[in-house]
Curated annotation (Swiss-Prot):
The gene is slc38a9. This is Neutral amino acid transporter 9. It comes from the Eukaryota. Belongs to the amino acid/polyamine transporter 2 family. SLC38A9 subfamily. It is a multi-pass membrane protein.
Length: 554
């Protein structure tokens, strides 16, 4: 028993090393737990650093037991109580360096700048294409105010999600995600309802992606066909005059048309055949099935994850495109609260809930924010970094939304012509818009399998306990998800409508209801629940419910 209390490192050497433990220039401050004698060399011509026989014996036992079974077998892994404390363990590299392990929870990987950028990059999605349309639906002044207020509200709710794990006493929640917190407070209902709303957000995103990919593939193919065959096509729609052409595809309706309207100059028969086989809603959504259905069946999405940088490149290019177009077109604004005008919209419109639905999804990161912040090097900065990230996201949305809305040439075009995907306001022959569509198309084709993988993990993993139970199960799920996307792209290609419905639905649970309820329950259990807190958080829940209900009346 006395031998168990023997220090692993000779006390005199340990105390001497401890004095210089934080001195980066002292090589002894990076001493590994154990080094084989053949690796021990003199340091600055001093005597070699010797390790006790107890440490040497323990090292040999750990190596011995690790070879008795398969590495995947957990039965013979050394238990925690026989290992040194985390602060005494070093990872020794054959390259000659030793890395100190600060803790066993794996935190402390990324700086604040990296964390902020990760959150910004994760939140920047397809919603940015519909922000100008949402501002048009709400009115310019009202839309900008709603953007600001929704950013603050969703940030507060996200803050409550981050703090939710800390409200659980006497339990190690270091590896918990927000659905685990929901299960703790609401039981199996919390678990399955969080799964349901998470699937709503994922499948909604996949539907939007399918509609947009059909749109981008159609316009890309049309541009290439016209260029290769030297076809001179002018869009037979309302447009402005000038080199930076802006069009109004649907002057009398906010619903996208199922066919393009062009006047062509060339071989009419060939062009008519091309239009028959290359239709935005009748054929192109089905062509995507051949491209994407096999990709959804991959067991691992690691290959597609390598292309995540394309999302950042696409957003930067979109912002640059909007800046360039706005500089050339100039601003066209006229403020009016009540007067109905031919080319402008009122500053306040009753259809503003369409923007709140879009923004709920645009600011939605609540189901994965805990995971993103786990790797923050300084956990004390989580709230600050989250706030900065939300500020940058909000500024990006406001910049794109205001620039597109304000620079839309009115007159001769009405602001009502702003499309749910603002790239549709640029003709297929626009080279800058063509490059943007190419970027977004390729980026979405790499992200779509990742979304499908997440759906598979959450649905099949919960039902069967295996994310790949069989080829038949995976294929059936993929066909169902792809089928929904094809149907929506064929009969309801309105990304603004899809985004606002899915955003209001998943946001009801993850943004408005669960964070507020969990906070009130935790305060009640500690005897700290006050009337003003009840009023604030009940109001947030009511706003979430009203946001969802209002989408059905727009």
């Amino acid at each position: 028993m006395d031998s168990d209390q023997t220090p692993l490192i000779n006390p005199s050497l340990f105390e001497e090393c401890a004095q210089n433990h934080f001195a980066a220039t002292d090589p002894r401050s990076r001493r590994p737990f154990h080094i084989e004698p053949s690796y021990i060399t003199s340091i600055n011509d001093d005597d070699p650093q010797r390790i006790t026989s107890v440490a040497s014996a323990m090292n040999k036992r750990i190596h011995y037991y690790s070879k008795l079974s398969n590495p995947s077998d957990k039965g013979l892994i050394a238990p925690d109580h026989v290992l040194p404390a985390p602060e005494e363990i070093y990872v020794y590299s054959p390259l000659g360096t030793a890395l100190k392990i600060d803790g066993s929870d794996g935190t402390g990987k990324n700086s604040s700048i990296v964390t902020i950028f990760m959150i910004w990059n994760t939140m920047m999605g397809t919603s940015i294409l519909s922000i100008p349309w949402g501002i048009k639906q709400a009115g310019f002044t009202t839309g900008v105010c709603i953007l600001f207020l929704m950013g603050i509200l969703t940030l507060y709710c996200c803050y409550r999600v981050v703090k939710s794990r800390g409200t659980i006493p006497l339990t190690d929640t270091s590896n918990w995600e927000f659905p685990d917190v929901c299960q703790y407070y609401f039981g199996s209902f919390g678990r399955w309802s969080s799964l349901l709303f998470s699937l709503v957000s994922l499948i909604g995103a996949m539907i939007v992606y399918w509609v947009l990919m059909s749109n981008f593939l159609f316009n890309t193919g049309k541009f290439i066909y016209n260029y290769v065959n030297d076809v001179n096509v002018t869009d037979d729609v309302l447009s402005n005059n000038g080199s930076d052409k802006v069009i109004c595809p649907n002057p009398d309706s906010t619903r996208p048309l199922n066919k393009s309207m062009d006047t062509y100059f060339g071989n009419g028969t060939n062009y008519e055949q091309f239009e028959t086989w290359w239709s935005k809603t009748n054929t192109v959504p089905f062509y995507l099935v051949v491209l994407l259905l096999p990709l959804l069946s991959f067991r691992s999405p690691s290959f597609f994850a390598k292309f995540n940088i394309l999302g950042t490149v696409s957003i930067i290019y979109l912002v640059s495109l909007v800046t360039l177009k706005a500089a050339h077109l100039g601003f066209h604004l006229r403020f009016s609260w009540n007067q109905v005008q031919e080319f402008f919209v009122p500053e306040f419109r009753l259809s503003f809930p369409q923007l709140t639905g879009i923004l709920t999804l645009a600011f939605f990161i609540h189901n994965c924010i805990i995971t993103l912040l786990k790797n923050n090097r300084n956990q004390k900065n989580n709230v600050r970094d989250l706030s900065i990230a939300y500020l940058l996201v909000g500024l990006t949305y406001i910049y794109v939304g205001v620039a597109v809305f304000a620079s839309f040439p009115s007159p001769p075009l009405s602001k009502q012509c702003i499309q749910q995907n603002f790239l549709d306001n640029f003709p297929s022959s626009d080279i800058l818009a063509f490059v943007a569509r190419i970027f977004l198309l390729f980026q979405m084709m790499t992200v779509y399998p990742l979304l499908g993988y997440l759906v598979r993990v959450q649905l099949l993993g919960h039902i069967f306990g295996d994310i790949y139970p069989s080829v038949f199960h995976v294929l059936a799920l993929n066909i169902a998800v792809v089928g929904v996307g094809v149907i929506m792209a064929r009969f309801y290609p309105n990304i603004g409508g899809i985004i606002r419905f899915s955003g209001a639905a998943c946001g009801l649970a993850f943004v408005f209801v669960y964070p507020s309820l969990i906070h009130m329950i935790s305060l009640h259990r500690r005897g700290q629940l006050k009337v003003h807190s009840i009023l604030i958080h009940v109001s947030i829940i009511v706003l979430g419910i009203a946001n969802l209900i209002a989408q059905f009346f727009m």
